[in-house]
C-alpha cells in the first residue's frame, strides 16, 4: 500500500461501527483524535431536527451534546452549518453552467472571486461561508475534469487538500458540503474526484465515516468505474489503496466488496489484497485458507470471463520487471509459499536415504510424513498451483518449484483424503514435469513412485476407497507402453478437474522412466491380474478402477502377448457388479471377446485368451434354473446374470461373424453347447432387464439386439403385447386380490387336482384361478405340472373354462421360460398310442424339424385353447429353425470350400459352393414353411364325422350366390351345439390369423402355397379369413400361365373369390386376363380337357360379372363361343344341340324377356335333356345355367 496516508489518523473499525449503529456509549469511549474525525456528522446529528422523536433518542442526543461540549472544533462546524446553503447551491449551479459554456476553461469563478493569496492562505483567513465556497469551487473543478477525461486518470495538485495544517478543517468543510448539497455533490462522484488529489484516500474514509450508510454505494461505484487491471496504472493502484482503506475501516464488508470485484471483473489486485488482509486477520492453521479458496474459485470456477480476467492479472504481473514486495501478486505468491511450507515439517527420512543412490549427499533432508490434518489443505494447494501454472500461466520460481516438489513427494496417511492427495500429486508431476530439473529431484520422484507401487494395496485396504491410485499408475503405464499420450493428458486433466494445455513432448522423460525403470509391460500385466476386483462395482463408484486398467491391457493385447490368463479376473468382476451399471463393463466384455477370437499377432495365431467355462456360467444361473428365481437372498445379482448373458450372446455372434478367420486356427474357440443355452432363462432375464432400463444404461437395448439376431423366436410381437398386458395395470389389480390361499397351493396339490379331473373339476379350477393371481416368476414351479396334464384335458366333458385358464397360465409362463415350456408342451401333447413308447423331443430336435409340433394328438385340432398354444409354438419354432440353419451354415462354411490344390484354374468359381448352400437352405426353409401351411389348411377341413353331421354348411365360410360371406345361422342353430362359435370355426380363425402373419412376413410363402394348390373348398375360408390374401393378385397371372390344367383351374377359382373380396382395378385387369386366357384355351384344348377345365371354372365367370359388370359382354361372348365349339364337336347330336344354341343366341340378344322364363320352375325342372352323358352336352347345359344366372344377377341389379 502506498505511503501516502502515512502519519494520518484514520477512522478505526471500532469508531466506524459505533457510527453505523449510533452507539453513543461506544462513541463516548473514543479518544479525542478519533472523535475529532467524526465531528461533522455528530454536530449535524445534535443540531438538526431528528426524525426519531422517541425518548431513548432524546437521551442519546443529550449524551452527544455533552460529548461535544468540551471540543473546541465544534464551534467552527456549527458556523459552517449556519451558512445559507440554498444561495450557495444557486451560485454553484451558475458557475457550472458558465464553465459548460466556456468549454471547461478556467474562467472567472462565481463562487470564489478576487483571490488575493494562495488557496491555503485564503482558506486560513476566510470565514465559514467563504471556506465553503473555496472548497466547493476546487471540488467542482476536479469533478468537471473527471467527467471530461472519460475515465482517463489524472492527478491534480491542490494546496487545499495537501496542507497538513488544514486537513481536518478541509475535511469538515467537505463533509458538510456533501451532506447539505447531496444533489450537487453525489457521494460517488466526490469519491472519484478525491482519488485525483493527494491524501484522497484519507478524505474519502472521513467522508464515508460521516455518512456510514453510503459505504456499499461508494465501494460499488469505485469498483464499477475502475480499471480491469489495477496494478498496471497509477489510477488503478490509487483506487485499490483507497478501497483497501475503506475495507480496513469496515472489515465486516470486505468480503462483500471482494464479491463486487469479481462480479464486475475489475481491480483483481484489490480482490487479492482484501483476501490477504482477511487471511492475516482470520488465519487458520489446519484448514484451507481463504486465499487458496478465493483464487481457486476464480481459476477453477465455471465463469470463463472471470477465469480469463484473473489469468491476465497473473500474466501481466509476471511481465513487469519490478515485482517488488509492494506488488499484490508478489504478496499473494509469498503468502501461498508460506502456507505450503507451513504444512511441510522437515524430517530426516532414513528410509529414503537408505534406498537412495549412494552418491547422494548424506545431509539430504526430505519433506515426509504429511500430517492427517494437513492433507486436505495440501490437496487444495496442489490444485491451486496447477491452476496458476496451467490456466493463468504462472512461472514458478526456483524456491516455489522446490517446495512444490517436496510437497508432491511427501507421504500422506492412508485415508481417503490421502489417496486423493497422492493421485493429485502424481497427475501434477505428469502435467508439470519441468518442476523436476535436477538429477537429485528426479531420483526423489522415482523413489516416491516406487513407494506408491509398494503402498497402494495398503492404502486401498486401510482407507476403504475402491478407486486407489494404484489403478491410475497401471493405467498411465499402459498408456505409455501403447504411446497413447493424449489419453494420459485426458486422464491428468480429468483427475485435476481442469483443462490445461500439456504438450506431449513434455511427457517424454516420464515415459522413459515409466517404461524402462518402473513399469515394464510384463510387470504391468502381471501386476494387473493380482489387483483385487472392485466389490459391488457400479456407476456410483467413480475414479480410476482396476476395470479401466484391465480394459486397456486387453485392448493392447498385453495378456495374450505375455501369456497371462485374465479370464478368472473378468469372471470375478462380472460377478461383483450391481446397479446402476458401470459404463466400462460392456466395453470390457466386447474387448475380452475380441481377445478370445482374434490372435494378438500373425506370427503367433494361438495367442488368445480363454473363454469363460460352461460350468462357471451354470454356477451363476443355478438360482433361476431350478425355479428359485424368487429367492430372497441371491448369491449373484441380476446385473451379473445379465452381463454374463450379454457375454454369451455377443460371443456366439462374434464366433459366427469370424468363422472364416477362425478356420485357419489349429485350436479354434468352441461355441457353447445347446444344452447350456437351454438351461439359461433368457426371456426371464430380459424381462428383469426391462424393469431396470434406467439403471442398466445401454445393456437392455444391446440384449434386445442380440436376441432379435440370434433368438428371433423369443422376440415374437404377440409375446411382447401379451407381456404388456401381464405387467400392466391389470397385474397390479390382481396382486391386490392375491390372498394367502393363493400362495398355499403347491405343485403337488395341483397334480392331485388334475388326477381328479375325470371325477371332479371344481378343485383344479379353484387352484388354477388362484394361480392366475401370481406373477410369471412365481408360476415357474407349476409349469411342469400344467404341461404334463394337458393331454388328459383333451378328453370329452372337460369344461371350456379349465381349458381357457390353462391357456392363460401357459401364456403367462411363456413370458419367462418359453423354450423349456415349449419342449414340455410338445412332449405332453404327443398322441397317446398304446404299446408304443413316446419319444421325448429336445429343443434341438424341434429347431431342426418344427413340424413335430403339428404331430400332436388329433384332438388338439378341435380344442381351440390348446390349438392356440400349438400355433404359438409352431410360429416360434419356424423362426428358430431359420436362425438355427443360418448359424449352421456359417459354422460349416469352410466344409464345402475347395482345397487350394483343387482350385487351380477355377478362379472366379470359388464362391459357387457357398451360393449353392445358401440356395439349399432357402429351399429347405420354403419347403418347411409351405408344409406347415398345407398341414394347417388341411386341419381347417371338416372331418368325415363333421360332414356327416352336416356341420360343413354351418361352420365353414361358404359361397352363397357367389358372394363370399361368413354364414349367419338361425336361432335354432345357435341353440344347437354346432354354431358359429363351434370348435372348428374357432380353430379356423386361429389358423387364418397365423397364416396372415406368415404371408405378411414372407409373401413368397403365399406364392409357393398357392402354386402347390389346396382344396378349392377352402378358398372361401382363406380369402375371407386371411386379410393378406390380396397379395395373390400379384402372381395369379403367372399361375394362370402354368402348363398344368389343375393350376390354371385353381388360379381362376382363387381369382373369382378375390374379385368379390377385393373389387380393385388390379383385380379387374387380372380378371380380364383370365377371361382372355379361357378364350384362348377353348381353341387348343381337346374335348376331354375342355370338359375338365370349363366345368369347374364356369361358375367363376358369374363372380367376375358380379364384381365387374364391364366384363359382361366379353363373358357372354365367351360362353356362346364355348357352346358353339361344343355343338360342332357332336355332329350326331346336332338336332338336339341346335335348340340350345338358338336359345343361347336369343338369351344374349333379349336377356330381359328370358329373365321371366328362367324364373319359371317348369323351366328349371323342364324338358331339357339332362340325361345325356355326353360331356359336351353337359357343358352346354352348364353354360346355359351360367348365362341365366348372370342375366338374373344383372336384371335384379345385384
From Swiss-Prot:
It holds the Pfam family INTS2. Keywords: Cytoplasm, Membrane, Nucleus, Transmembrane, Transmembrane helix. It is a single-pass membrane protein. Component of the integrator complex, a multiprotein complex that terminates RNA polymerase II (Pol II) transcription in the promoter-proximal region of genes. GO terms for cellular component: cytoplasm; INTAC complex; integrator complex; nuclear membrane; nucleus. The lineage of its organism: Eukaryota, Metazoa, Chordata, Craniata, Vertebrata. Belongs to the Integrator subunit 2 family. Signal peptide: none annotated. Component of the Integrator complex, composed of core subunits INTS1, INTS2, INTS3, INTS4, INTS5, INTS6, INTS7, INTS8, INTS9/RC74, INTS10, INTS11/CPSF3L, INTS12, INTS13, INTS14 and INTS15. The core complex associates with protein phosphatase 2A subunits PPP2CA and PPP2R1A, to form the Integrator-PP2A (INTAC) complex. GO terms for biological process: RNA polymerase II transcription initiation surveillance; snRNA processing. The keyword Membrane applies. It comes from Mus musculus. The chain crosses the membrane at residues 421-437. InterPro entries: Int2_metazoa, INTS2. It is found in: Nucleus; Nucleus membrane; Cytoplasm. This is Integrator complex subunit 2. Disulfide bonds: none annotated.
Amino acid at each position: 500500500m502506498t505511503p501516502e496516508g502515512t502519519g494520518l489518523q484514520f477512522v478505526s473499525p471500532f469508531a466506524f461501527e459505533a457510527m453505523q449503529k449510533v452507539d453513543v456509549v461506544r462513541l463516548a469511549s473514543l479518544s479525542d483524535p478519533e472523535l475529532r474525525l467524526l465531528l461533522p456528522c455528530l454536530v449535524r446529528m445534535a443540531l438538526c431536527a431528528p426524525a426519531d422523536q422517541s425518548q431513548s433518542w432524546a437521551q442519546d442526543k443529550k449524551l452527544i451534546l455533552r460529548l461535544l461540549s468540551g471540543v473546541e472544533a465544534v464551534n467552527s462546524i456549527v458556523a459552517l452549518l449556519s451558512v445559507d446553503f440554498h444561495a450557495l447551491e444557486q451560485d454553484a449551479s451558475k458557475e457550472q453552467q458558465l464553465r459548460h459554456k466556456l468549454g471547461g476553461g478556467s474562467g472567472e469563478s462565481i463562487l470564489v472571486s478576487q483571490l488575493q493569496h494562495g488557496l491555503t492562505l485564503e482558506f486560513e483567513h476566510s470565514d465559514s461561508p467563504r471556506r465553503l465556497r473555496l472548497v466547493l469551487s476546487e471540488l467542482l473543478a476536479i469533478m468537471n475534469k473527471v467527467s471530461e477525461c472519460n475515465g482517463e486518470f489524472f492527478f491534480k495538485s491542490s494546496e487545499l487538500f495537501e496542507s497538513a495544517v488544514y486537513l481536518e478543517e478541509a475535511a469538515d468543510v467537505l463533509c458538510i458540503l456533501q451532506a447539505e448539497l447531496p444533489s450537487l455533490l453525489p457521494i460517488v462522484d466526490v469519491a472519484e474526484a478525491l482519488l485525483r488529489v493527494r491524501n484522497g484516500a484519507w478524505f474519502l474514509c472521513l467522508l464515508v465515516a460521516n455518512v456510514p450508510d453510503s459505504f456499499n454505494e461508494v465501494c460499488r461505484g469505485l469498483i464499477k468505474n475502475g480499471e480491469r487491471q489495477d496494478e498496471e496504472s497509477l489510477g488503478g493502484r490509487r483506487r485499490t489503496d483507497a478501497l483497501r482503506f475503506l475495507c480496513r475501516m469496515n472489515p465486516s464488508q470486505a468480503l462483500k466488496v471482494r464479491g463486487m470485484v469479481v462480479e464486475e471483473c475489475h481491480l483483481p489486485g484489490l480482490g487479492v489484497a482484501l483476501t490477504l488482509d482477511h487471511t492475516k486477520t482470520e488465519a487458520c492453521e489446519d484448514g484451507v485458507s481463504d486465499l487458496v479458496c478465493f483464487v481457486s474459485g476464480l481459476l477453477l470456477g465455471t465463469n470463463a470471463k472471470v477465469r480469463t480476467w484473473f489469468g491476465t492479472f497473473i500474466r501481466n504481473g509476471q511481465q513487469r520487471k519490478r515485482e517488488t514486495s509492494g506488488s499484490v501478486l508478489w504478496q499473494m505468491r509469498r503468502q501461498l509459499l508460506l502456507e505450503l511450507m507451513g504444512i511441510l515439517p522437515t524430517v530426516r527420512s532414513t528410509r529414503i536415504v537408505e534406498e537412495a543412490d549412494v552418491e547422494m549427499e548424506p545431509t539430504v533432508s526430505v519433506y515426509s510424513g504429511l500430517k492427517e490434518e494437513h492433507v486436505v489443505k495440501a490437496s487444495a494447494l496442489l490444485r491451486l498451483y496447477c491452476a496458476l501454472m496451467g490456466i493463468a500461466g504462472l512461472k514458478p520460481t526456483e524456491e516455489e518449484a522446490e517446495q512444490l516438489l517436496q510437497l508432491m513427494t511427501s507421504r500422506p496417511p492412508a485415508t481417503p483424503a490421502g489417496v486423493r492427495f497422492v493421485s493429485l500429486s502424481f497427475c501434477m508431476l505428469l502435467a508439470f514435469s519441468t518442476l523436476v530439473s535436477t538429477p537429485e529431484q528426479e531420483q526423489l520422484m522415482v523413489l516416491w513412485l516406487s513407494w506408491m507401487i509398494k503402498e497402494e494395496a495398503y492404502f486401498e485396504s486401510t482407507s476403504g476407497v475402491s478407486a486407489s491410485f494404484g489403478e491410475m499408475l497401471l493405467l498411465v503405464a499402459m498408456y505409455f507402453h501403447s504411446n497413447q499420450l493424449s489419453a494420459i493428458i485426458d486422464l491428468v486433466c480429468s483427475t485435476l478437474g481442469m483443462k490445461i494445455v500439456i504438450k506431449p513432448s513434455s511427457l517424454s522423460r516420464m515415459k522413459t522412466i515409466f517404461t524402462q525403470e518402473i513399469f515394464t509391460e510384463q510387470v504391468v500385466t502381471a501386476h494387473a491380474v493380482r489387483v483385487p476386483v472392485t466389490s459391488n462395482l457400479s456407476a456410483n463408484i467413480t475414479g480410476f478402477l482396476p476395470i479401466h486398467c484391465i480394459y486397456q491391457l486387453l485392448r493392447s493385447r498385453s495378456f495374450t502377448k505375455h501369456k497371462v490368463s485374465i479370464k478368472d479376473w473378468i469372471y470375478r468382476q462380472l460377478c461383483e457388479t450391481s446397479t446402476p451399471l458401470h459404463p466400462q463393463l460392456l466395453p470390457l466384455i466386447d474387448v475380452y471377446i475380441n481377445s478370445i477370437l482374434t490372435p494378438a499377432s500373425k506370427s503367433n495365431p494361438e495367442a488368445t485368451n480363454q473363454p469363460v467355462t460352461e460350468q462357471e456360467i451354470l454356477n451363476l444361473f443355478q438360482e433361476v434354473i431350478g425355479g428359485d428365481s424368487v429367492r430372497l437372498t441371491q448369491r449373484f445379482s441380476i446385473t451379473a446374470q445379465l452381463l454374463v448373458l450379454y457375454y454369451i450372446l455377443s460371443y456366439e455372434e462374434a464366433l459366427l461373424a469370424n468363422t472364416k478367420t477362425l478356420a485357419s486356427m489349429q485350436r479354434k474357440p468352441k461355441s457353447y453347447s445347446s444344452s447350456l443355452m437351454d438351461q439359461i432363462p433368457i426371456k426371464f432375464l430380459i424381462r428383469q432387464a426391462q424393469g431396470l432400463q434406467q439403471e442398466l444404461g445401454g445393456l437392455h437395448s444391446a440384449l434386445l439386439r442380440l436376441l432379435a439376431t440370434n433368438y428371433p423366436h423369443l422376440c415374437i410381437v404377440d409375446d411382447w403385447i401379451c407381456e404388456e398386458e401381464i405387467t400392466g395395470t391389470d397385474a397390479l389389480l390382481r396382486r391386490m386380490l392375491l390372498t394367502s390361499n393363493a400362495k398355499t397351493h403347491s405343485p403337488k396339490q395341483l397334480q392331485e387336482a388334475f388326477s381328479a379331473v375325470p371325477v371332479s373339476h371344481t378343485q383344479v379350477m379353484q387352484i388354477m384361478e388362484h394361480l392366475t393371481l401370481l406373477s410369471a416368476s412365481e408360476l415357474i414351479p407349476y409349469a411342469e405340472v400344467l404341461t404334463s396334464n394337458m393331454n388328459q384335458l383333451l378328453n370329452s366333458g372337460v369344461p371350456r373354462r379349465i381349458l381357457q385358464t390353462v391357456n392363460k397360465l401357459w401364456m403367462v409362463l411363456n413370458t419367462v421360460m418359453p423354450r423349456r415350456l415349449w419342449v414340455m408342451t410338445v412332449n405332453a401333447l404327443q398322441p397317446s398310442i398304446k404299446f408304443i413308447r413316446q419319444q421325448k423331443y429336445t429343443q434341438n430336435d424341434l429347431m431342426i424339424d418344427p413340424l413335430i409340433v403339428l404331430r400332436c394328438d388329433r384332438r388338439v385340432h378341435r380344442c381351440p385353447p390348446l390349438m392356440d398354444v400349438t400355433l404359438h409354438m409352431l410360429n416360434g419354432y419356424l423362426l428358430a429353425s431359420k436362425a438355427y440353419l443360418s448359424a449352421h451354415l456359417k459354422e460349416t462354411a469352410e466344409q464345402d470350400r475347395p482345397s487350394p490344390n483343387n482350385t487351380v484354374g477355377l478362379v472366379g468359381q470359388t464362391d459357387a459352393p457357398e451360393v449353392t448352400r445358401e440356395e439349399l437352405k432357402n429351399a429347405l426353409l420354403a419347403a418347411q414353411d409351405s408344409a406347415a401351411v398345407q398341414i394347417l389348411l388341411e386341419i381347417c377341413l371338416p372331418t368325415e364325422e363333421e360332414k356327416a353331421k352336416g356341420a360343413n354348411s354351418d361352420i365353414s365360410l361358404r359361397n352363397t350366390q357367389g358372394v363370399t360371406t361368413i354364414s349367419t345361422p338361425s336361432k335354432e342353430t345357435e341353440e344347437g351345439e354346432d354354431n358359429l362359435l363351434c370348435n372348428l370355426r374357432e380353430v379356423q380363425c386361429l389358423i387364418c390369423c397365423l397364416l396372415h402373419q406368415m404371408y405378411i412376413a414372407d409373401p413368397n410363402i403365399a406364392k409357393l402355397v398357392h402354386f402347390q394348390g389346396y382344396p378349392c373348398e377352402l378358398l372361401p375360408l382363406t380369402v375371407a379369413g386371411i386379410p393378406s390374401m390380396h397379395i395373390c393378385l400379384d402372381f395369379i397371372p403367372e399361375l394362370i400361365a402354368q402348363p398344368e390344367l389343375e393350376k390354371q383351374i385353381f388360379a381362376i377359382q382363387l381369382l373369382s373369390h378375390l374379385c368379390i373380396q377385393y373389387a380393385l382395378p388390379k383385380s379387374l385387369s387380372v380378371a380380364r386376363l383370365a377371361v382372355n386366357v379361357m378364350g384362348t384355351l377353348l381353341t387348343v384344348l381337346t374335348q376331354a380337357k375342355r370338359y375338365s377345365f370349363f366345368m369347374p371354372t364356369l361358375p367363376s365367370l358369374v363372380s367376375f360379372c358380379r364384381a365387374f359388370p364391364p366384363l359382361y359382354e366379353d363373358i357372354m361372348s365367351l360362353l356362346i363361343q364355348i357352346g358353339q365349339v361344343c355343338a360342332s364337336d357332336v355332329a350326331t347330336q346336332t338336332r338336339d344341340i341346335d335348340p340350345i344354341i338358338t336359345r343361347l343366341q336369343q338369351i344374349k340378344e333379349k336377356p330381359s324377356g328370358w329373365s321371366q322364363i328362367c324364373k319359371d320352375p317348369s323351366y328349371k325342372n323342364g324338358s331339357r335333356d339332362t340325361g345325356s352323358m355326353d360331356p359336351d352336352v353337359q357343358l352346354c347345359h352348364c353354360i346355359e345355367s351360367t348365362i341365366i344366372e348372370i342375366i338374373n344377377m344383372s336384371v335384379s341389379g345385384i
